[in-house]
Amino acid sequence: MEAVVNSDVFLTSNAGLKSSYTNQTLSLVDEDHIHTSDKSLSCSVCNSLSQIVDDDFISAGARNQRTKPKRAGNNQSQQPIKKDCMVSIDEVASTHDWSTRLRNDGNAIAKYLTTNKYDTSNFTIQDMLNIMNKLNIVRTNRNELFQLLTHVKSTLNNASVSVKCTHPLVLIHSRASPRIGDQLKELDKIYSPSNHHILLSTTRFQSMHFTDMSSSQDLSFIYRKPETNYYIHPILMALFGIKLPALENAYVHGDTYSLIQQLYEFRKVKSYNYMLLVNRLTEDNPIVITGVSDLISTEIQRANMHTMIRKAIMNIRMGIFYCNDDDAVDPHLMKIIHTGCSQVMTDEEQILASILSIVGFRPTLVSVARPINGISYDMKLQAAPYIVVNPMKMITTSDSPISINSKDIYSMAFDGNSGRVVFAPPNIGYGRCSGVTHIDPLGTNVMGSAVHSPVIVNGAMMFYVERRQNKNMFGGECYTGFRSLIDDTPIDVSPEIMLNGIMYRLKSAVCYKLGDQFFDCGSSDIFLKGHYTILFTENGPWMYDPLSVFNPGARNARLMRALKNQYKKLSMDSDDGFYEWLNGDGSVFAASKQQMLMNHVANFDDDLLTMEEAMSMISRHCCILIYAQDYDQYISARHITELF
């Protein structure tokens, strides 16, 4: 009974309808410079635009398209908006003649709030449920509360609060400066309508027929070309080598460049950009990009990075894992400064946070204790892109390891030192750590009150595991050459998590590469050498380790793995007689496979693992874990227009 009462903490937590977004660090627009496709030593935005011009997308014989004429606007008469005023998100987020049941319900709740003069500063989920009862709004799927709350934010009128007018997308929508129009005219010349449209169409068509890397267009994967040194980062593979709910809709169906275009030219957005726009308008903190000094240039660079990642997604799903120096996304992601986090991030957290922040993706909503004036705490709902797990701050034993499973998943806390949501199981004692505000919202009987979960997930749930033992002393291996020590404390990672009656399966994991050998699980080496990814495909766990192509020992280990996988196919999963086969009938296959690996080509089946091998590696070396619903189930629970 105690658990049921305490679980109401989630329902009565402050929903945070009032916007706290502040963007006072950058100027509106650079009055002295228009970004072009000419390479420049002084402007990183111009450099990235020049790379987009040089990109040779799939042409497929498409006719060059003409840009539609823009509506004439009296930009000269428009005055800059005051910094302290508010603008209704619904004015910005209107779409071309389409609506959904979810959006209509949000309108009804917002109208009820304004008619009855509700104080939105103290609005809670319980208040919303009470209003839904009065309005006869029935929502059986708990996940829909996540989206409904967002729509309530977006449909409140000007008397309530939605978004600060200093948000760059609102400034573009309101045409706050004539220079914005001048810059977008130049962008239209740079982004070839044919090439960009083909890139969008190709990735969206791929998405329709893609499940994971076992359904790639070509199962013969190319890891490297002689003239290239860059490769698709394992974190990108973990996010896009398998189709993840919600993230797929934001990155593949949504497009930042066309979003900017539509906001400025038509003051409306197409349906495929709607959820991307709402994600962006409801983000808590802006990002700052090193070397970019104004808001509009930041949005342009954001659109450039979205396009670069889209091209990487297209290549991943075609089995092309190498890229030219100009196409590498990692250096751009490392230049993003996350103003909501007060600590220096490790390389892998920086890349993960940057990829998600480009589209404002925050799929997890949790109830956490937030300090007030340093003397008390208030329960607030916090949207988070990922949950942080720090084994070095947890005291564990062999009898009580860190466990990520259906029982412990409900324990979250807020780390005031870094501004992040952390995983804090009650049996670990995380609450005594500095800066961490831990209040168990479920009492003791967690499993008995699982239906009252203080966690709502929109499609995917991500964990970042901090294993670097000296993160705060050194950082940035790729720039300083320093080798981090990795804490290989085993974590009990469950392949499945039941949350709110929905099954979330472990879809992918990024692990630290410690030993020199490709499959050396028992290595005593504790120094970081890179990362690799394990995807849980329809054909079993599959490993992506791009660094193995640079190491002869790793190539030999991969060759042995490929040969054993081939022999298991022929012998019905038996290892008996492998070496006799290798010296006899399998010698020709071994020679051809060795030649393939020397040419940096591998088949999908070559890198398949057993479930035991995969979970053993993940337990000791994982740094990123991604759980998600099955994509088909995610789609079937929603109306088609709600997906975008």
From Swiss-Prot:
GO terms for cellular component: virion component
Modification after translation, per record: The 73-kDa precursor is cleaved to a mature protein of 60 kDa during virion maturation. Proteolytic cleavage of major core proteins OPG129, OPG136, and OPG098, which occurs at a late stage of core formation, is required for production of infectious mature virions (MV).
Keywords: Virion
Transmembrane segments annotated in the record for this chain: none
Subcellular location: Virion
Keyword Phosphoprotein part of the UniProt annotation: no
Positions of the propeptide removed during maturation: 1-61
Function: Major component of the virion core that undergoes proteolytic processing during the immature virion (IV) to mature virion (MV) transition. Essential for the formation of a structurally normal core.
Family: Belongs to the orthopoxvirus OPG129 family.
Protein name (record): Major core protein OPG129
Organism lineage: Viruses, Varidnaviria, Bamfordvirae, Nucleocytoviricota, Pokkesviricetes
